[in-house]
Regions:
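Intrinsic disorder/low-complexity detector
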Residues: 1, 47-76, 118-125
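Negatively charged, low-complexity tracts enriched in Asp/Glu with abundant Ser/Thr
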Residues: 28-60
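A structural feature that tracks compact, well-ordered secondary-structure segments
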Residues: 3-7, 13-33, 42-45, 69-75, ...
């Protein structure tokens, strides 16, 4: 089972990663949070939106979907990435770069599987 790991940044803010059962990071917070409570709210937003539809921006003439959604895209280095956007359009999570689009899609599926029931662990400073 996956888990959300909340940690404190060097500047005293908070961030989170969603890790799969194997310990691999499958989603990182797209921002840092000024308080632990606001970071936990970010985690809850990921949970709530973890089974959203996928807007495949790697396809020419892709159909724009409503929020919440995962946006699948190709970065400047040619790797496939995704970001999770909440109902209000705010970016709440982002992925690492994947060489293969299929791997990125597997990452999205893993979020849908892991996030809803994932434990939340707050790392000690």
């Amino acid at each position: 089972m996956g888990k959300f790991v909340i940690s404190k940044t060097k500047n005293g803010e908070y961030t989170f990663n969603l890790k799969a059962g194997n310990g691999e990071v499958i989603l990182s917070a797209s921002e840092t949070y000024s308080s632990l409570d606001s970071c936990k709210n970010g985690v809850e937003s990921v949970r709530k939106n973890s089974n959203s539809h996928v807007e495949d921006q790697t396809k020419e003439g892709f159909e724009q979907l409503t929020h919440p959604k995962f946006e699948l895209y190709t970065d400047k280095a040619g790797q496939t990435r995704f970001r999770l956007k909440a109902r209000n359009g705010e970016n709440i999570g982002r992925s690492e770069g994947y060489k293969a689009k299929a791997s990125a899609l597997n990452g999205i599926a893993s979020i849908g599987k892991n996030a809803p029931e994932a434990d939340v662990v707050v790392e000690e400073e």
